[in-house]
Every structure is written in C-alpha cells, then in structure tokens.
Amino acid sequence: MNSRRQHRTTTKLRPRHRTARFALALLVTGLLASAWSHAAAAQQPLQKLLVLDFELIDQQADVVPFPEKEARLAMASQRLREALVKQELYDVIDIAPVAQLIRTEAARQSLLECNGCELDIAREAGADRILLAWVQKISNLILNINVKILDAKTGQVVMTNSVDLRGNTDQSWQRGIDFMVRDMVEKNEGNR
C-alpha cells in the first residue's frame, strides 16, 4: 500500500514538473532573445543628436521675477547633454558650429514654433535627430520639463517625454532631468 501511495504522489507531481520545465524554457528563451536584441542595438551606431538649449515658457514672466532663469536653463541644457552621453542613448554633437544660426533664428522666434527652422539647424549641424527642450513654468511650485526628438530629414516626432516638477530649484530641475533620462533608458528610447 505504501508503494501505491508513493506512486500516486509521484504521478501527481509530474504535470507540475512539466509545467515548471516549460516555464523555465520560456524564461531562458526570453532572456536569450532580450540579450540578443540588446547586443544588436549596441552594435548599431548611435544617431547623431543635436540638443538645443532649454527654452522657458513662463506664464507669470511679467508678474513674478525669475532672476536665475538663464543660469538654470544653461545648467539644465548641459545636464541633459551629459546624461544622454553618459547613458549612451545618442551621439550628442557639439552645438558650437551652428551657434550663430541658432542665435539668428532664436532672435526671430521661439525655436519651438519656427515652422521647421530647427530641422534646417539640425541638417546644417550634420545631425540625424534634433532634441527640443523646454520648461513650462506655471508657478514657482508647478513646472514641467519637456523634450521632443525629431528626425532631421523628415521632421517626424520620434520621441516625446515630460516630467512634472514641484518646486523651482536647481535640485528639482536636476532631479527631473535625471528621472527623464532614466525613464528613456528603462523604456529603451535611445538611438531612435
């Protein structure tokens, strides 16, 4: 009788073992496919990305002074460029060769709404993609950081991202940019 009970127990466990082996095989296959796709992506050359400086959309500009505006926008632009390079999301190219063209266009209008002038700037710089970045300031407490990446040839939007901030400080802006880049890494949004 004891051997019969043992046989039943063994028989009951066998389907579980098959299911576990099947699940393990699926897991290993998935991991190998993921590793292969990451390796293939790593072998592709990085897209050349021109990162324009942050612009500020400030709905209270006439009412609430923001004396550190220029310094904070410059800090944010530099931090974003460095983070994209560090994470190897793009080949961020130097903005200096097109700085005069950028100044000329920016003096006429916002580069966020210039009807394609940003694409001309990107092509002049030899970029595959261009990143437009802006901070929308609702108040000193409520802000958001936004980025949009466009294909320099077609103008097609290839990625957008936005992060809400609470507080208008260097630290909140830095954390927002760090979060945005980390989110891009986690979602595999680089090199698009």
Feature-to-residue mapping (PLM):
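N-terminal secretory signal peptides that target proteins for export/translocation
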Residues: 1-18
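Bacterial N-terminal signal peptides
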Residues: 23-35
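Sec/Tat signal peptide C-region and signal peptidase I cleavage site
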Residues: 36-42
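C-terminal/domain-edge helix-coil "capping" segments
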Residues: 42-61, 77-83, 87-90, 115, ...
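N-terminal segment of the mature soluble domain
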Residues: 66-113
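Surface-exposed patches in mature extracellular/periplasmic domains of secreted proteins
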Residues: 95, 134-135
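Conserved acidic residues
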Residues: 128
